[in-house]
Amino acid sequence: METLQTFHGVLDRGFTGNMSFQFHIPHGIHELSVILTYEKERIQDPASYIERFRHPLIRQAVPYLGRIPTDRQLQEMGQAMKTEIQLCAMIGGVFAGNVHMPGTRKEILLKEGVRSRGCLPYDGRNGMVKIIVNVYQVVEENTPWNLEIKGGPGHVETDRTA
């Protein structure tokens, strides 16, 4: 497969939102691979993070705990926090798939007879592709991300009557 488009950037701590990318699938492309990678999934130094953000963490925890969290609970919260990013694809306005498995690499593979977990079967159709990167939480400053869209001719039977 050849690279059709690449996008990259940096996310700030606390960012929540969506990034949307649209492009036309060139004629002759019958398989797509959409790969999102990012760094800093977990807090790099939980103890330092807790000290810097102690008061906001306590404010967030009190409604759930019904009291001020202990230092141990704050430490557990810091170790459990992670950056959460999902990857979604639509082709011609039709949902093609959504990947939200753990890890810093999310891939949607759309190929006739093969599909990624969380994706629908792909019939090799062309049209506008809309890639949506859903960002639910970023735990560290300057979190780099990269989105690469690859495509190839794949194998598409043109005469199924033979």
Regions found by a protein language model. Name each.
Residues 1-162:
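Acidic, Ser/Thr/Pro
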